[in-house]
From Swiss-Prot:
Residues in the signal sequence: none
Stated name of the protein: UPF0060 membrane protein SCO3297
Cell membrane found in the keyword field: yes
PANTHER family: UPF0060 MEMBRANE PROTEIN YNFA
Transmembrane annotation, as ranges: 8-28, 33-53, 62-82, 88-108
Family: Belongs to the UPF0060 family.
Pfam families: UPF0060
Its membrane topology: Multi-pass membrane protein
Keywords of this entry: Cell membrane, Membrane, Transmembrane, Transmembrane helix
Coarse class of the protein's main subcellular location: membrane
Length: 112
């Protein structure tokens, strides 16, 4: 159950962080307006709170593991939101990142 909770929190964090960054990008770079950018700033702020709900108490471990989700989520966001087409190296790299995330978060440990 803790693995499912942790994975769900990583997905929520990715939606806030990647979505927030995308909104800032759209607002500034694509000139959609400052309301888009402001929405992005709010989403990025919300992202900062999500990690505090992770069951593991080690900040460094949580953020390091989240990196794998961020990489994979960013590629997926690009596919859905921008029509990006990842190549085999993008996919292989994302899979390596996910394997690293799983190892960091859920490898058996003796007391910590």
């Amino acid at each position: 159950m803790l693995v499912l909770r942790s994975a769900a929190l990583f997905v929520v964090a990715a939606l806030f962080e990647i979505g927030g960054a995308w909104l800032v990008w759209q607002g500034v770079r694509e000139q959609r307006g400052w309301l888009w950018a402001a929405g992005g700033v709010l989403a990025l702020g919300a992202y900062g709170f999500v990690a505090t709900f992770q069951p593991d108490a080690h900040f460094g471990r949580i953020l390091a593991a989240y990196g794998g989700i961020f990489v994979t989520g960013s590629i997926l966001w690009g596919v859905v939101a921008d029509g990006y087409r990842p190549d085999r190296w993008d996919i292989a790299g994302a899979l390596v990142c996910l394997a690293g995330m799983a190892l960091i978060m859920w490898a058996p440990r003796n007391g910590g």
